[in-house]
From Swiss-Prot:
Keywords: Phosphoprotein. This is Protein phosphatase 1 regulatory subunit 3G. GO terms for biological process: glucose homeostasis; glycogen biosynthetic process; positive regulation of glycogen biosynthetic process. The modification Phosphoserine is found at S81. InterPro entries: CBM21_dom, CBM21_dom_sf, PP1_regulatory_subunit_3. Residues 13-22 have a biased composition (Polar residues). One of its GO terms (cellular component) is cytoplasm. One of its GO terms (molecular function) is glycogen binding. Residues 200-339 form the CBM21 domain. Induction: Up-regulated during fasting and down-regulated after feeding. Pfam families: CBM_21. Glycogen-targeting subunit for protein phosphatase 1 (PP1). Involved in the regulation of hepatic glycogenesis in a manner coupled to the fasting-feeding cycle and distinct from other glycogen-targeting subunits. Residues 1-77, 258-286 are annotated as: Disordered.
Amino acid sequence: MDPSGEQLHRSEASSSTSSGDPQSAEELSVPEVLCVESGTSETPIPDAQLQDRPLSPQKGAALPEQEELQEYRRSRARSFSLPADPILQAAKLLQQRQQAGQPSSEGGAPAGDCCSKCKKRVQFADSLGLSLASVKHFSEAEEPQVPPAVLSRLHSFPLRAEDLQQLGGLLAVATMPDPLLVPCARLRPHFQLPELRAAEERLRRQRVCLERVQCSQPPRAEVTGSGRVISCPGPRAVAVRYTFTEWRTFLDVPAELDPESVEPLPPLQSGDSGSKAEDSEEGPGTERFHFSLCLPPGLQPKEGEDAGAWGVAIHFAVCYRCEQGEYWDNNEGANYTLRYVCSTDPL
């Protein structure tokens, strides 16, 4: 075909399109592509016609790039129409229902009315004409009045077999011997305290003398005692040193002096040998002291063990410190000793 005839045919087609009736919606929806060829004018050509026409090598190479670009644009446009997060959609739906005030499925009333009906209220007794407090006065001379219905119900229930068994157990416990009379290990002193005159003589000689010792009953483990010291001016203190490890270790416990118990020491009789002239006069004043020793519970023998073979002993001595010096009462060098003995007699 002649090239000039082809150009004339294209121009007539374009003029007939412009001067004819308006195109239908289907024809308008067909996309047009601006096609530019060498030696021709720029004329928009429908996409359907381009598909039928053979493509040049340059256009064939550029066509895949255009398709990729169009696919990318479609994916971008489609991403804006994706559904939102389900949680956000549920929250929006609940918010819309609350704003619209939809009625409940059962009563047909809004959901907010139920909360208003079920709202708790507080009423006081005085607002209803009642008293805020109820006072009941009881008298010691007044006997409590038990309702007859309660008494009849109490008498209608006889003792059960379990109650009788418990009663028998209580009677058996009541007939048991006194537990204090059961032989058990008790602390006993293994020394003899001096008599009154011998204690006064010891007090004059060493200025301190132990006069009384008492051991507590099991299961307590305590030793208490008292004695006297010759009072002197200035600071003074009394302590008890004791051990239960045969003096491998020992403890010093301070004793308590009683300054209100000051009493003069009786003078020596003239017939006593070795007495001095000043001893015939009234003796110096004395003060009484008290102490308490706490023993560990592991020292006491267990039940069934021989207390004699246990071999545990408590040794102690009394120390008196004053401005004149330090004085000891250690039972004439033998120490005061306590041991566990199985016995039923109290000390």
